[in-house]
Regions:
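PP2C/PPM-type serine/threonine phosphatase catalytic domain
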Residues: 1-230
Length: 230
């Protein structure tokens, strides 16, 4: 199950999410300058997130024995090569993306988290959800950024599912503090990611000027995915 909603009408959704056999990816595109400012890239942030996410799903599933950090480094290199002749990839505002991905492996569910999107493990034995995120640099045009990602393996014992969420979706708990993490997981597992995003939007609609929750973006792109394992 997955859902995504742009934060600004009339502006492309810069989140990207997709899934394939035994794997899923979620990216949150970003840049360091305001919209419409020069980034050195003629394609834009939404294109970069989509291109990198598509490439990562392909590399992660084509070579299941390759660690996810290696799959990400390969995907970054592929996307770099797609536009290095048309865009200035040394520009300080070149498009970037947070990255999360999970893949089924014999030992459990392998995960990778780069920057501030989240991977959440949902256990069915009473344990609270395990939240995995990383605050290092985002992916840009340098494959070595993959080495900064948090990676590991979630054991399958007692695991009901895993969730991927962009920071626009986790605002409901991180910024607004309206739901604790266990309730976030319950909502997306039992009612779907779209329900969670609607709750985020309802909170934002109730604070249109950012007085209750001061924030740089009144609404951000919000994306969530839940992968049922049992």
């Amino acid at each position: 199950m997955l859902a995504s909603d742009p934060g600004s009408p009339g502006w492309p959704n810069e989140d990207f999410v997709c899934a394939g056999p035994g794997a899923a990816v979620l990216l949150d595109g970003a840049t360091t300058v305001p919209r419409h400012a020069d980034t050195g890239c003629e394609h834009g942030v939404a294109w970069y997130a989509r291109a990198l996410g598509t490439a990562l799903l392909a590399t992660a599933t084509a070579e299941p024995r390759q660690p996810l950090a290696g799959a990400l480094a390969e995907a970054i290199a592929q996307v770099r090569d797609q536009h290095k002749d048309t865009c200035d990839l040394t520009h300080p505002a070149t498009p970037a993306a947070t990255v999360t991905t999970v893949r089924a492996e014999p030992g459990g569910i392998a995960y990778l988290a780069l920057s501030d999107s989240s991977v959440a493990a949902d256990f069915g034995d009473g344990r609270p959800p395990l939240i995995l995120t990383d605050r290092h640099r985002a992916a840009r045009a340098r494959p070595d950024a993959a080495a900064d990602a948090a990676t590991g393996m979630i054991p399958r014992a007692g695991l009901r599912g895993v969730a991927l969420l962009s920071d626009g979706a986790t605002r409901i708990t991180d910024l607004y503090q309206l739901l604790p993490w266990p309730a976030v997981i319950d909502v997306i597992r039992d009612h779907g990611p779209g329900r969670l995003i609607r709750q985020v939007r309802a909170a934002e609609a109730g604070d249109p000027d950012g007085e209750r929750w001061p924030r740089a973006k009144l609404s951000d792109d919000a994306t969530a995915l839940y992968w049922h394992l049992t």
